[in-house]
């Protein structure tokens, strides 16, 4: 069964909305680095069959689509919320803040938002479970957020090469956990996340 990932947008166009943004984040799970959110508005009816949930795409494909989305989107907003804020307000609230901030950075004010399973303030919205698979706007936002965050983690890898951030992007892989135990906690690790918090208590 093929999924019509324009169905949510079409329903809103039929209700008279013109500017609909999809919003998603990347980086809720990692032990290090920021959470990044993106908001994307396409022209009414825009479709591209390859734009899908960023997690299902190869890094190379994501980067190709990142450029395509930048070319075709009417507006893109991106927000980066760092590890210190994540530790202060928790990852769920940090992700929510990043999504709301990404919307505020759009050069066109959206009339409605579609989010990937997140409640937000300041705009009428629909929270969609597995939204990055069901809405092209959310899928595009997931790609923008993921590619942006991955690039940031590659940059961090140059500052802290011993942790291998360019490979695992901060996720808790075996290699990352081994590096954590060997080298200790870096300045960009999330101190409230269990494996890091455990190390800090030792």
Swiss-Prot record:
Bound cofactor: record note: Manganese or magnesium. Binds 1 divalent metal ion per monomer in the absence of substrate. May bind a second metal ion after substrate binding.
Organism: Acholeplasma laidlawii (strain PG-8A)
Protein's name according to its UniProt entry: Ribonuclease HII
Gene3D superfamilies from the UniProt entry: Ribonuclease H-like superfamily/Ribonuclease H
The family this protein is said to belong to: Belongs to the RNase HII family.
InterPro entries in the cross-refs: RNase_HII, RNase_HII/HIII, RNase_HII/HIII_dom, RNaseH-like_sf, RNaseH_sf
Taxonomic lineage from the root: Bacteria, Bacillati, Mycoplasmatota, Mollicutes, Acholeplasmatales
Subcellular localization(s) per the UniProt record: Cytoplasm
Pfam family, one: RNase_HII
Function description: Endonuclease that specifically degrades the RNA of RNA-DNA hybrids.
Keyword Metal-binding: yes
Residues that hold a divalent metal cation according to the record: 24-25, 116
Key words, A-Z: Cytoplasm, Endonuclease, Hydrolase, Manganese, Metal-binding, Nuclease
MF-aspect GO terms: manganese ion binding; RNA binding; RNA-DNA hybrid ribonuclease activity
């Amino acid at each position: 069964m093929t999924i019509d990932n324009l169905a949510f947008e079409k329903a809103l166009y039929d209700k008279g909305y013109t500017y609909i943004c999809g919003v998603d984040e990347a980086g809720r799970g990692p032990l290090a680095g920021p959470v990044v959110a993106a908001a994307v508005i396409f022209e009414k009816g825009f479709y591209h069959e390859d734009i899908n949930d960023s997690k299902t795409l190869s890094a190379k494909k994501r980067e190709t689509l990142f450029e395509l989305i930048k070319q075709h989107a009417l507006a893109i907003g991106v927000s980066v919320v760092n590890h210190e804020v994540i530790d202060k307000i928790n990852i769920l609230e940090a992700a929510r803040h990043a999504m709301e901030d990404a919307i505020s950075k759009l050069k066109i004010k959206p009339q409605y938002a579609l989010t990937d399973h997140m409640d937000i303030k300041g705009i009428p919205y629909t929270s969609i479970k597995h939204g990055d698979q069901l809405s092209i706007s959310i899928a595009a936002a997931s790609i923008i957020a993921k590619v942006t965050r991955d690039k940031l983690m590659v940059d961090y890898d140059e500052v802290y090469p011993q942790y291998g951030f360019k490979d695992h992007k901060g996720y808790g892989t075996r290699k990352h956990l081994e590096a954590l135990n060997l080298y200790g906690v870096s300045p960009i690790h999330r101190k409230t996340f269990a494996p890091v918090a455990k190390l800090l208590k030792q």
